[in-house]
C-alpha cells in the first residue's frame, strides 16, 4: 500500500454535506484495507481564483495509506459528485500525521482569541471585586 495526500474542494452551498462526504470517502478507503492517518476539515476558505464563478469553497485534507485501486475508486467518486469542485491526489513517501500548517495557524488563532477573551473577562471580575469591597466599606 502507498501513502497519499488528498485535498478536495466542495461547493460552498454544500458545506452541510461535508461530514457525510468525508465519512463516505474514508469508507471507500478503509473497506479496501486502507488507513486514514490525518483528516483535517479546513472549512470554508477564499479561493485563489474563481471556479465556476465561485469565490469560496470548503476545503478538506486527508493523508491516507491505501491501494491504488481504492484511490482510483475515490477519484471516480470525486469526478461524479457535482459538489466536488476540484480534487488533487498526490503520492507521498511516508505517512504524515502531524498537523498541517493550515491547522497550526488555526490553532494559534483560536488560542489567541481565547487568551484575549480571558484578559477581557479578568478586568470585569476585578471591577466586581472592587464594587463588593466598596459596598462593604459603605456599610
Swiss-Prot record:
Disulphides: none
Stretches the record annotates as Disordered: 97-139
Annotated keywords: Ribonucleoprotein, Ribosomal protein, RNA-binding, rRNA-binding
Record-level GO BP terms: translation
SUPFAM superfamilies with a match to the protein in the record: Ribosomal protein S6
Residue ranges, compositional bias (Basic and acidic residues): 104-139
GO CC field: cytosolic small ribosomal subunit
Presence of the UniProt keyword rRNA-binding in the record: yes
CDD domains for the chain: bS6
InterPro entries, sorted: Ribosomal_bS6 (IPR000529), Ribosomal_bS6_sf (IPR035980), Ribosomal_S6_plastid/chlpt (IPR020814), Transl_elong_EF1B/ribsomal_bS6 (IPR014717)
Task performed by this protein: Binds together with bS18 to 16S ribosomal RNA.
Family: Belongs to the bacterial ribosomal protein bS6 family.
PANTHER family documented for this protein: MITOCHONDRIAL 28S RIBOSOMAL PROTEIN S6, SMALL RIBOSOMAL SUBUNIT PROTEIN BS6M
Record's protein name: Small ribosomal subunit protein bS6
Organism: Shewanella sediminis (strain HAW-EB3)
Gene behind the chain: rpsF
Amino acid at each position: 500500500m502507498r501513502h497519499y495526500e488528498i485535498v478536495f474542494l466542495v461547493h460552498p452551498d454544500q458545506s452541510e454535506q461535508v461530514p457525510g462526504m468525508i465519512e463516505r470517502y474514508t469508507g471507500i478507503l478503509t473497506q479496501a484495507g486502507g488507513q486514514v492517518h490525518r483528516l483535517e476539515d479546513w472549512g470554508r476558505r477564499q479561493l485563489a481564483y474563481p471556479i465556476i464563478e465561485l469565490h469560496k469553497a470548503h476545503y478538506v485534507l486527508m493523508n491516507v495509506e491505501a491501494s491504488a485501486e481504492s484511490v482510483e475508486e475515490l477519484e471516480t467518486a470525486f469526478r461524479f459528485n457535482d459538489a466536488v469542485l476540484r480534487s488533487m491526489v498526490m503520492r507521498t513517501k511516508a505517512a504524515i500525521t502531524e498537523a498541517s500548517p493550515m491547522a497550526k495557524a488555526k490553532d494559534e488563532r483560536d488560542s489567541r482569541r481565547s487568551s484575549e477573551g480571558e484578559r477581557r473577562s479578568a478586568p470585569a471580575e476585578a471591577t466586581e471585586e472592587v464594587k463588593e469591597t466598596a459596598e462593604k466599606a459603605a456599610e
